[in-house]
Amino acid sequence: MTEETAHRTLVAVCERVGLDPAGAELIRIGSNAVYRLAKPVIVRIGRDGETVENARRQVAVARWLASENYPATRALDVDQPVELDGHVSTLWESASEREEYAPLAQVAELIRRLHELEAPASLALPRIQPFAKLDEYLPDLERVDGADAAFMRERIEQLRSRYEALDFALKPGVIHGDANVGNVILDREGHPLLIDLDSFCTGPREWDLVQTALFFERFAWHTEEEYRQFVEVYGFDVMTWPGYPVLAEYREISMTLWLCGKAVADEGAAAEVRKRIEAIRTGGSRRDWAPF
């Protein structure tokens, strides 16, 4: 998705629901294109291939969380999702004019509260299928060096076998699916809100804890004190669970495969992919991995 195609879709979506796209700010463009309108509304334009079913589920999840008085992003009260120009778009209340991330203790509190909820059967949340996501990314390996691609394919198969043998410690249930500090922002009053509901599903709760642990332990993006507070508030340290290295490696591989999709048009991304694959191959430091 280019900025040009995203903006064209934005204009059409706004016309459909009666909003004004003038002055819209492009917040980011990646898996989705995200715009903030002059009216406090966020428009998320889905990537190629995103289904109406998945977008409907995001909106339904948001409305369920609102009914539970759970602090999460709120779906705009319009007929949505909107399917136009081959993209599925959703519209959300804008919680703030800037993206300010919540402290880790508040991230842990929202994850803990989420895990205390029981989703109604009507939501029809899917069971997490982590390797289906990796399989979607596999074609992008054709964009990297042949030896690197072969190594990553073999590593994924090894990881698949290790994952199937895991014995999870926590009771399964509803999970965010991509819980980390980047998906908990502060609203205008400084209260934390859970955002990006597109990975909501059911499954082992460890999935919602592993990224914070990974960002602390391998990337040093969080301090020891921040991680201690996270564990204290949630009540479980996923790093003490024997399966942690498997989920951590899964996340590293997923982050790297996602970046492969950008490697053709962006030499910086291509260099980062090579660096990451070498670190995975050799067990090298991840502390120089650049965020994308």
Give the location of each predicted region.
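Regulatory N- and C-terminal appendages and interdomain linkers associated
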Residues: 1-21, 150, 275-292
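A conserved alpha-helical element in kinase catalytic cores
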Residues: 7, 44-85, 97-116
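ATP-binding glycine-rich phosphate-binding loop
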Residues: 16-37
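Active-site acidic catalytic loop and adjacent metal/ATP-binding pocket
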Residues: 30-43, 75, 161-209
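A conserved loop-to-beta-strand element in the N-lobe of protein kinase catalytic cores
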Residues: 84-92
